[in-house]
C-alpha cells in the first residue's frame, strides 16, 4: 500500500507531465498556419474554408467565400501548388488575438520538375481565437519580386 507522500509524489509527477504536454496558444497558432499551408498544397478548399473566420477580409475586401473561390481558381490553373515559408514566422500574441508576418514562395505547375509559375510574397495575417481554435480574420499579401 502506498503512503500519502508516495501518492502525492505520483500525483505531482503526473501533473508535471501533463503540464509539459499542454500546447501553448502560440504553438497552436503556428500549427494552424502549418495546416493552412498544407491545405493549400493539398488543394483542399474545404480545409482552407475551415481556417478562415466567417468575417474574414482579404486584399481588396475579398470575403471568406471570395478567398475560397480564389484558391479554387488557382487549383484549376495549376495541378500542383507549392507553398514554402522563406524565413521564420513573426508572431505577435495578444489575449484572444494575434498577428503573423512571414515571407512565402508560392509555386504552381503542371506536375513537371520545374514549376510553371513562382512568386515571393510578403504576407501579414490577423487571427482570432474562437472556441479554442485560431481563425484567420484578415490577410494581406504583396509580391516581393
Language-model segments: which ranges?
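Solvent-exposed loop/turn segments at secondary-structure junctions
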Residues: 55-57, 106-107, 143-144
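Surface-exposed, charged secondary-structure patches
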Residues: 72-117
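Short, low-complexity N-terminal intrinsically disordered segments enriched in polar/charged residues
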Residues: 19-51, 68
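A short gly/proline-enriched turn/hairpin at secondary-structure junctions
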Residues: 51-64
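Sec-dependent bacterial lipoprotein signal peptides
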Residues: 1-18
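Residues that flank catalytic or metal-binding motifs in active/ligand-binding sites
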Residues: 52, 87, 123
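Short beta-strand edge/turn micro-motifs at domain boundaries
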Residues: 22, 99, 117-145
Amino acid at each position: 500500500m502506498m503512503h500519502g507522500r508516495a501518492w502525492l509524489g505520483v500525483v505531482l509527477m503526473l501533473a508535471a507531465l501533463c503540464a509539459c504536454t499542454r500546447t501553448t496558444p502560440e504553438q497552436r497558432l503556428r500549427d494552424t498556419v502549418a495546416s493552412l499551408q498544407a491545405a493549400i498544397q493539398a488543394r483542399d478548399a474545404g480545409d482552407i474554408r475551415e481556417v478562415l473566420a466567417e468575417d474574414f477580409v482579404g486584399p481588396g475586401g475579398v470575403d471568406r467565400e471570395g478567398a475560397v473561390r480564389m484558391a479554387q481558381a488557382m487549383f484549376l490553373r495549376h495541378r500542383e501548388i507549392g507553398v514554402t515559408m522563406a524565413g521564420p514566422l513573426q508572431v505577435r500574441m495578444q489575449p484572444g488575438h494575434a498577428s503573423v508576418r512571414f515571407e512565402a514562395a508560392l509555386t504552381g505547375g503542371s506536375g513537371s520538375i520545374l514549376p510553371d509559375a513562382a512568386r515571393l510574397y510578403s504576407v501579414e495575417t490577423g487571427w482570432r481565437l474562437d472556441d479554442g481554435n485560431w481563425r484567420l480574420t484578415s490577410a494581406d499579401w504583396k509580391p516581393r519580386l
